[in-house]
Amino acid sequence: MIEVKDLNKSFGSFKVLDGLNIRVKKSSVYGLLGPNGAGKTTLIKHLAGIYKQDSGSILVNGEPVFENPAVKSSVAYISDDLYFFSQYSIDETARFYSTMYPKWNWKRYEQLKQVFPIDSGKRVTRLSKGMQKQVAFWLAICTMPEVMLLDEPVDGLDPVMRKKVWNLVLQDVAEREVCVMVSSHNLRELEDVCDHVGILHNGKIIVERELDNMKSDIHKIQVAYSGSIPENILSGEEILHRSQNGSVLLMIAKGDREKILAKIRESSPAILDILPLTLEEIFIYELGGIGYDIKN
């Protein structure tokens, strides 16, 4: 389990994390969203024990992670910027990992050779970026982690390998109750794997919800009228987005679904549809609602 309380971090005069609070349970996949510069990588590096916080607490399974080798040995971190020893083959890197991670599983390492079709005798740094990313997952999964921290984890992987990797991660979440935090700009992909989502903005989590609940609170509504579109159809509701194409009106509204629909029906529309809402749309319009200059 991950628990962060009142986390603060500055680099010089620039405050990156500002009183941040977050909690991720076992057997959960938490998607960390936010614009560039929001502090996502900084947060993940704190959780991995790379950075020391200015103030606040960071606990993994109830223990502080910074300068705590016992806790770090239960955490697998896959960075967006991978690093491997320049002269090591995959097998040599695996042997090094086995000395650093007490729960290293050689049986699993051999089994995963069927998933990752790479010659394990090859030097890692001579592999393509996509193959290096496969190696990173291969090794991380074999450490048998209790917590996985993934920063833009599947960049460079082809669609088939992405699916294989996520299947392995989700299998560990289900069978070993692994706690996963993943930061990615591929919102469509996060939508398929995450059960909780947090939006990071200016060093704080501004929205944190179960993904299903988040979708139930924001609605994409298409309305058509036989004549002109009435004014102020949802004047009493929070409208995150509104666009018009002829007699068809598209709205993104936040609030109670039944109350919103009842209000719209008062204007006697010819057509009233609720459309599927993607995580990407939720992200855009939630941020748009707090002053982001996002154009469509």
Residue ranges of predicted features:
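ABC-family P-loop ATPase nucleotide-binding domain
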Residues: 1-8, 290-296
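A structural detector for beta-sheet-dominated domains
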Residues: 5, 25, 224-226, 254, ...
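Short, flexible helix/strand-to-coil boundary loops that buttress conserved ligand/catalytic motifs
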Residues: 69, 215-218, 234, 264, ...
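Short, surface-exposed beta-strand/loop "edge" segments at domain boundaries and coil↔beta transitions
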Residues: 148-149, 153, 228-232, 258-261
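ABC transporter nucleotide-binding domain
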Residues: 165-255
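C-terminal coupling/interaction segments
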Residues: 252-296
